[in-house]
Amino acid sequence: MKTTYWAMLLMLLPSMAYTQTTEKENEFTMSIQIRPRAEYRNGALMPRNEGEEPAGFINNRARLSMEYKRSDLQMKISAQHVGVWGQDPQIDKNGRFIMNEAWAKLNFSKNFFAQLGRQTLSYDDERILGGLDWNIAGRYHDALKLGYADPNNQLHLILAFNQNDETKIGGTYYVQAGAQPYKNMQTFWYHYKSDYTPFDASLLFMNLGLETGDAATKESHTRYLQTMGTYITYKDNGWNVDGAFYYQIDRKSV
């Protein structure tokens, strides 16, 4: 009886080990977020003028996210519906359900990666680039992100080029209203974390291309706005201090 028991146990061990390894190599997660928020606006964003009535409403975010991960590949798809309670009819054939994230990340090695698709860009204190998650809709970008990381250094290069639709001819005139607020973007971000000092530092350079062409003729003209700066943090002995400085360059106001 004992011999049979030990034989069965030994047969099970390889199967258990294989199952555990497979689970670590291939991970699939799914999350659901329902986030209603009631607001009473009595002078929101600007003082309320005399005679104007306050506003009240309930908005809601319903988001479904699915993510797959293994050693060299990570993919995520996330879709959401954002709206105000009562905004849609009870019978609605045209639902407003959009993709807020749809990207794939390929790890070329332990240090280098490329991430392509619709993604959230969140850096430092999120003053320049952030996910804006406090907003009911959040914020996303259609971009290619190339990165390097080691225990002390992180470097990201972000590239984006936006158009309103597929066209055969007509140039690259871009209508920013109701779409992404820029025509193209190139961003470099570097973060350094020291093992010996309580200081961390980040450097950011962003070049934004903004469409300023002729809307009537669709003649495209792009002006560029550069933003550069640093973000520094200090954490030691109960102290937590952070500071940021950014500077913008533009030949002509856009």
Task: Label every PLM stretch briefly.
Residues 21-23, 107-114, 132-253:
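Signature for the C-terminal beta-barrel architecture of outer-membrane proteins
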